[in-house]
Each structure stands twice: as C-alpha cells, then as structure tokens.
Amino acid sequence: MPKQKTHRASAKRFKRTGSGGLKRFRAFTSHRFHGKTKKQRRHLRKAGLVSSGDFKRIKAMVTGL
C-alpha cells in the first residue's frame, strides 16, 4: 500500500498549536476594507482555531500534523 500524500495547500494554511489544535487564518482579509468596521478589521487580524467538525477532515489531508 503506498503512503498517503500530504495535501500541500492545506499544509501551508494550518499550523499545529501546543495543545494539539489547528490554527487557521481568517477569510475576507485581502481587500475591500472600507466596507468593514474597525472592530471587524481588528478581529480579522487574529488567527482562529479549526472547529471540531473540520478537524478530522483536515487532519486526514495533512498527514504530518
């Protein structure tokens, strides 16, 4: 049986946290900031954690995490 390949796009987008979770960056941060409030822009700068429902799928795609 061949080894499972890592999904490279996912490997670049997610990092493992110290407690075992997956850190992700937020969407809607590339342009059109004039339509967003200052509070929205500030919260979009912070990284988020992957939800438990998505965790299993992403972990299967990224074998090295």
From Swiss-Prot:
Q: Name one Pfam family in it.
A: Ribosomal_L35p
Instruction: Give the Basic residues compositional bias ranges.
Output: 1-16
Instruction: Extract the PANTHER family matched here.
Output: 54S RIBOSOMAL PROTEIN BL35M, LARGE RIBOSOMAL SUBUNIT PROTEIN BL35M
Similarity annotation: Belongs to the bacterial ribosomal protein bL35 family.
Q: Name one GO molecular function term.
A: structural constituent of ribosome
Cellular component aspect of the GO annotation: cytosolic large ribosomal subunit
- The name of this protein is Large ribosomal subunit protein bL35
Q: Which UniProt keywords apply?
A: Ribonucleoprotein, Ribosomal protein
One GO BP annotation of this record: translation
* Source domain of life: Bacteria
- What InterPro entries does this protein map onto? Ribosomal_bL35, Ribosomal_bL35-like, Ribosomal_bL35_CS, Ribosomal_bL35_sf
Stretches the record annotates as Disordered: 1-20
